[in-house]
Amino acid sequence: MSRFRGGRILPAAAFLVASCGRAPEAAKVLDPTPAAVAAPAPVAAAPAAAAPADTSGYRTAFDFIANRVHAVSHREGRLVVDTGALDFLKYVDGGWKTSWLLGEKDEGKSASLVNGVSSMAFLPVDADGDGPAPGAGTLSITMRSLAPAQKVSIFVNEKPAGTIDVAGAKKRYDVTVPADELHVGDNRVRLTFKSAVNVPGGKRSAAAIQQIALGSASLGSPPADLGIVEARAANVGGVARRALVAGGHGSRISYYVQLPPAAHLAVGVGGEGNAPAPGGTALVRVAVDGQPARTLHEGPIGSRWNDLLLDCGAAAGHAARIDFVARGGAVAWAEPRVVVKAPPHAAPPSPEPHFDHLYVWMVDTFRADKMHAYNPKTRVQTPNYDAFAADATRFAWATVQGTWSLPSHASLLTGVYPTVHRATAHESKLSPTVPFIAEELKHDGFKTGMFSSNGYISAKWGFDRGWDIDRNFIRESLPNGADYLWKTAKAWITPLLPKHQFVYLATIEPHVAYTPKKEFLAKYWDKPYLGPIKPIQSGVQLGLIKGGKLKVTDNDKAYLEALYDGEITGSDALFAKFIADLKAMGVYDKSVVIVVSDHGDQFYEHGSVGHGDTVYQELTHVPMIIRAPGLLPKGMVVDSDVEMMDMAPTLLELAGAKPDPKMQGASLVPLVFDEIGVSPRAALTVDGQVARGLKVARYRLVHKGPGRMELYDEVADPREQKDIAADHPIALRGMRGVLGLLHAYETTWSKATWGTAANVTEAFYATAGPPGHLGAEPKSGGPK
């Protein structure tokens, strides 16, 4: 389940936001003042407004105005993209591998510069009207060359559309896209220039691009000024309300959003001013993949607000495109929202209890689908983890930020993305400038202990911060099983009771080498094995298998997985001892106990083994279970997407400590108490320059670079075996827009203030600034 949270908007696009680092000009681009517009108050002598639709008992799941950076703008039948605006990010994957210098200035105006001599954008087309259609088209680009004697070759879906001379003065250039070149879905537009010059910041650029428009060929050249979509106070019949407004007499504002079950749209419709009959038609439409678009409302644009409550019907629960269309007149769309029937917001107990003892039981390499509580069909026996889950709050969709130990543990302990903590390769180290949970809690009076059987979680990689005791059994050449780890930790904990303590228990099972005890392996392999796999050598052998130096049969593959499954059941038994000891010590019902993992392991779901080199669900989806007696409900399942970096701010709240504003994650406690299953939340996995994984509601996007996108439906296809990107353009466009926003702001995103990239708050516009640069990305280099 999940929660949606809820000036000017720039043309085009449907799911975007953000910025990264520089100061502002954004204040001119996105004016946050409409957020302050009060509830509408009638002006004296105004005509009576239509009775508003009854939304009592409904809660807002998605506020279209707050999410205005996700708006895709069409004017007079054309998709309009302002490249100097935040919404440009959704068309260029946030600048990742699409070769743009974002958030720049050209001749005093916001623009994006071509990074070098070539760049690309991806523009959506559909067949539902009021925008570009499949077939031939007219592509209009407003730009100026930064180099003399410039030429640019333009390609649409890698087919040449023409080569033109580009002047040094800003000018619009119209190019005819040949018949049958535009198709439903995203269309790649690539610009390749002849030469580039040096620009500030040590970069080179061929041209400054200010606007892109795409329309059907029959429309010809667009008018000189297509205008922009605004989010502001609109006066209809003397009543002022916050609204989305598109100028002119033909517009379409589209959003690509994942609708919750039983979703409705609430919106007020009216023509600005006091004219008795502004004229024209207002239309609200919903479209989902594989189905014709459905009109939810069509009626005249009136001189009074007409408040609507529209049932999304079968589109609810799916990725959808919502269109707000004006034909023959200008429309103001007041307070447009996705709403659902739901009880009022809940609140935690008051005063909220805080805890003196915090224990994190980290299970290395534990896939969520190998625990019965997460996957009732699994053969793996985990009775103790399952019993704990039933006695705690379980987060059904926890996503790790890295797919091997170093970056993933680092995100959990710092509350930031890998691009910020920089611990992403064997030769890298945790940045000393990022927050660290042990230091935070030590400052608040906690005794802090690290007990780790993972060699990466050590001083060599920068983890020796804030611990009163810091033991790494790999580095100390000591036994590293969870039994020895807990025995050592218990000996340190016991004399300190009842003092405040935070203990991080980084167990190694079921990480390779896969060496389960015989009684646990026997549950999954009950016959002789005569193949090449040696349990004690399985870690080295996985590397040989990946490198093609060790050939394995289906029987060998099955044996490998049986070894892994046996390790998990062994871990489950050791966890039972940990819980029994906490109870015997008299602290179990006074403590926070958390079970998490840093990543999973793959067993040929996508052609390989081990971890650290993909962003599919078998590596990114892990257990997260929190027991906080008297605060978090027992047996509750939270179906919203959450990130492992949310753990650090959650621990701070549970301890009663002050939140650290440098942490990019957000405490999960408020989510538990406002968990109504309606709002999409974004969860990101980073594999350096290799891939990005994004989970939002039922979909996972795997992005390996421009034109290399895979999309999976986690409900219909939990093992991610069928890539549906080609025949789900609506779902793909929405996911791509969220990822573009998040990538551009990866180093500055703050979930506590901005929400998630799938559902932005008003605070984003006040503090984000214009899009900037990530700078040099940290290297990636996990187990291969």
Question: Residues of each region from the PLM?
Answer:
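Catalytic domains that recognize anionic headgroups
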Residues: 21-24, 29-109, 144-147, 152, ...
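C-terminal motif of bacterial Sec signal peptides marking the signal peptidase cleavage site
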Residues: 17-19
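Bacterial N-terminal signal peptides that target proteins for export
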Residues: 1-10
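Extracellular ectodomain segments of secreted/surface proteins
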Residues: 111-131
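Short histidine
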Residues: 166-176
